[in-house]
C-alpha cells in the first residue's frame, strides 16, 4: 500500500520532517517514491514552517495513496493558508 507520511530528518532535539510518498513496507526514514514538501515544527522568525505541493498530493490520493493522520492535519493547514 502506498502511504503519504512524514520522514524525520534534522538533528537531535531539532526535528525536521519531509512529507514523502512511500510504500508502507519501507522504513520510516528509508526509501520513498516522491517528496511532496516539508514540515518544520520549530520554525522561528521568517522560516517557513510548512511547504506542501497540494497538486501532487491530490494526484497521489486519486491514485489510491493513504494519508497518515498527521499529514491529513498538515494538508488541512496548507489548504487553509493557500
Swiss-Prot record:
GO terms for cellular component: cytoplasm; small ribosomal subunit. GO terms for biological process: translation. Pfam families: Ribosomal_S16. One of its GO terms (molecular function) is structural constituent of ribosome. Keywords: Ribonucleoprotein, Ribosomal protein. Gene3D superfamilies: 3.30.1320.10. InterPro entries: Ribosomal_bS16, Ribosomal_bS16_dom_sf. Disulfide bonds: none annotated. Belongs to the bacterial ribosomal protein bS16 family. PANTHER family: 30S RIBOSOMAL PROTEIN S16, SMALL RIBOSOMAL SUBUNIT PROTEIN BS16M. This is Small ribosomal subunit protein bS16. It comes from Alcanivorax borkumensis (strain ATCC 700651 / DSM 11573 / NCIMB 13689 / SK2).
Amino acid at each position: 500500500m502506498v502511504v503519504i507520511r512524514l520522514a524525520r530528518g534534522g538533528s537531535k532535539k531539532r526535528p525536521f520532517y519531509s512529507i514523502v510518498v512511500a510504500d508502507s513496507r519501507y522504513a520510516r526514514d528509508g526509501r520513498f517514491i516522491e517528496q511532496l514538501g516539508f514540515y518544520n515544527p520549530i520554525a522561528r522568525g521568517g522560516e517557513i514552517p510548512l511547504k506542501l505541493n497540494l497538486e501532487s498530493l491530490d494526484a497521489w490520493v486519486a491514485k489510491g495513496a493513504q494519508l497518515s493522520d498527521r499529514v491529513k492535519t498538515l494538508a488541512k493547514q496548507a489548504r487553509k493558508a493557500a
